[in-house]
């Protein structure tokens, strides 16, 4: 067999391998609808207050509106949930789960920021429901994107939330894969400088 024929055979095998690999690949489902949930949206709850005097709800309502606008430009539909009509946390989460289910959202994210008694606490973390592989994958994607953008911050990781832990009701109540975003500590002056909204 001539060298040129051997090369042709190798190229044929490579093409066949690529075709077989492509056929095995699962079709990637396009993201159609995102539920953007503003944390602390139940009656009488505004969340923690940052060192800049802005509470979680006010801060994240603005983030939600910006995110919705950005997604619209990407051709992705989203719905902002910023008013959970109940004082009770469990009833608010039940309502939210049903509302997101009716909208048939592909993913759900709830926007927060962390806070602690010490101003030295800092970093970002993304939470998912324990046992949810899709939720873990979603949280990992967000964490990776965050770490590439804000290299100066401490990476607190992707965290699984289980029964009895804060945030579990949201993560368990909503039908699609879900995560809670905690991108910084509002109680940290150093991080507030990075994340405060500027008009």
Question: In which residue ranges do the predicted regions lie?
Answer:
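Catalytic cores of processing enzymes, dominated by hydrolases/peptidases
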Residues: 10-13, 107, 130-185
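Long, well-ordered alpha-helical scaffolding segments within enzyme catalytic domains
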Residues: 62-72, 134-151, 193-199
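Extracytoplasmic/secreted envelope proteins and their assembly/folding machinery
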Residues: 61-64, 68, 93, 97, ...
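Active-site histidine-acidic residue metal-binding/catalytic motifs
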Residues: 2, 8-96
């Amino acid at each position: 067999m001539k060298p040129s024929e051997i090369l042709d055979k190798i190229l044929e095998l490579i093409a066949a391998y690529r075709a077989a690999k492509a056929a095995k690949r699962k079709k990637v489902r396009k993201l159609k609808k995102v539920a953007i949930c503003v944390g602390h949206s139940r009656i009488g709850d505004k969340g923690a207050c940052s060192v800049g005097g802005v509470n979680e709800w006010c801060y994240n309502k603005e983030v939600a509106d910006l995110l919705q606008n950005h997604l619209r430009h990407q051709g992705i539909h989203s719905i902002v949930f910023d008013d959970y009509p109940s004082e009770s946390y469990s009833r608010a989460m039940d309502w939210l789960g049903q509302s997101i289910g009716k909208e048939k959202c592909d993913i759900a994210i709830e926007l927060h920021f962390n806070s602690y008694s010490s101003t030295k606490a800092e970093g970002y973390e993304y939470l998912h429901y324990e046992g949810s592989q899709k939720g873990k994958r979603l949280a990992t994607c967000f964490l990776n994107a965050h770490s590439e953008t804000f290299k100066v911050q401490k990476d607190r990781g992707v965290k699984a939330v289980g029964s009895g832990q804060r945030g579990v009701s949201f993560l368990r109540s909503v039908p699609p894969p879900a995560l809670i975003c905690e991108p910084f500590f509002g109680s940290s002056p150093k991080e507030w400088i990075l994340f405060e909204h500027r008009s």
